[in-house]
């Protein structure tokens, strides 16, 4: 770009000088002392002399004057360096990012003072607490507490019902009792016998200590009554008070037992005392070994039915 501008200027100057010489041929130009060109212009003048051929007619050489200052400035103007695009522009100082939800302590907006509005004390009339109406409690007539079955006069009957598995175990085929020959017979059906044995032992374990003898007597009486019905023995049920019936005397009993049947009852008692304690781990007091039958009347006298 610079070379083009310089060549254009030189071409214009040469054309101007040639036209002036053709218009005034009488004017002789005296040679003047050549002044050295500036170093910056010498290569351009030599370049122009090489490109443009000199006219064959010698022309008087005009003194070459240096270009005016304005032209020199024009020639030197392209020599200025243009700003490079890589020049760094002044950077603005990075401001710290302010969070929109953060408040600056220096610029706190003045807040109006918190005004507490006076609340008028409203006391609503509260109705008096009335107790919840409860229905009148009806007192049911208290029934007299019945004594425990062990304390009832019907203890023998109760024990006979509870200890029925013991009677069935000793009387039936599990361990049949022959009241006539006092011997044991064979044992069959062990599975059902084991069930009756467990039930018998469970009932005996619930009997208090003071009623163990009564329990043994109940088992003996139940077996005796069962065998008496099978053998056709007549046992008359009576009231437990002593009474005079002909020549027979009832002693604290519920039935009448002939004297010849007393030995049979003793054999049953002996069998029960030998079987039940060892079978159920049932401790029998020593005084239970004697014959006590408060529920059976013993017949005394002769000829009583």
UniProtKB/Swiss-Prot annotation:
Transmembrane segments: none annotated. It comes from the Eukaryota. It is found in: Cytoplasm; Vacuole. Residues 55-66, 110-138 have a biased composition (Pro residues). One of its GO terms (molecular function) is nutrient reservoir activity. CDD domains: AAI_SS (cd00261). Keywords: Cytoplasm, Seed storage protein, Signal, Storage protein, Vacuole. Residues 1-19 form the signal peptide. GO terms for cellular component: vacuole. Residues 27-54, 67-90 have a biased composition (Low complexity). Developing endosperm. Residues 27-90, 105-146 are annotated as: Disordered. The keyword Cell division does not apply. Sulfur-rich hordein which possesses an N-terminal half composed of proline-glutamine blocks organized in repeating units and a C-terminal half where the repeats are dispersed and less conserved. Belongs to the gliadin/glutenin family. This is Gamma-hordein-1.
């Amino acid at each position: 770009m610079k070379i083009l501008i310089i060549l254009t200027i030189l071409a214009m100057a040469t054309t101007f000088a040639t036209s002036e010489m053709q218009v005034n041929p009488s004017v002789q130009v005296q040679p003047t002392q050549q002044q050295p060109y500036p170093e910056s212009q010498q290569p351009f003048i030599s370049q122009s002399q090489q490109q443009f051929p000199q006219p064959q007619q010698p022309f008087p050489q005009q003194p070459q004057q240096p270009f005016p200052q304005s032209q020199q400035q024009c020639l030197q103007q392209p020599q200025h360096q243009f700003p490079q695009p890589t020049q760094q522009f002044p950077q603005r100082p990075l401001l710290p990012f302010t969070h929109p939800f953060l408040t600056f302590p220096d610029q706190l907006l003045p807040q109006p003072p918190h005004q507490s509005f006076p609340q008028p004390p409203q006391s609503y009339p509260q109705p008096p607490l009335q107790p919840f109406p409860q229905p009148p409690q009806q007192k049911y007539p208290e029934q007299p507490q019945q004594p425990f079955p062990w304390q009832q006069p019907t203890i023998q009957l109760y024990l006979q019902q509870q200890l029925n598995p013991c009677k069935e175990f000793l009387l039936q085929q599990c361990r049949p009792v022959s009241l006539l020959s006092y011997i044991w017979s064979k044992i069959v059906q062990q599975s059902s016998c084991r069930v009756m044995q467990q039930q018998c032992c469970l009932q005996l374990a619930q009997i208090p200590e003071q009623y163990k003898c009564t329990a043994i007597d109940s088992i003996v009486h139940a077996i005796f009554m069962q065998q008496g019905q099978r053998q056709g023995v007549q046992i008359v049920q009576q009231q437990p008070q002593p009474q005079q019936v002909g020549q027979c005397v009832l002693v604290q009993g519920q039935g009448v037992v002939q004297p010849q049947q007393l030995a049979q009852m003793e054999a049953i008692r002996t069998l029960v005392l030998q079987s039940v304690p060892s079978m159920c781990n049932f401790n029998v007091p020593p005084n239970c070994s004697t014959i006590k039958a408060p529920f059976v009347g013993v017949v005394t006298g002769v000829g009583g039915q």
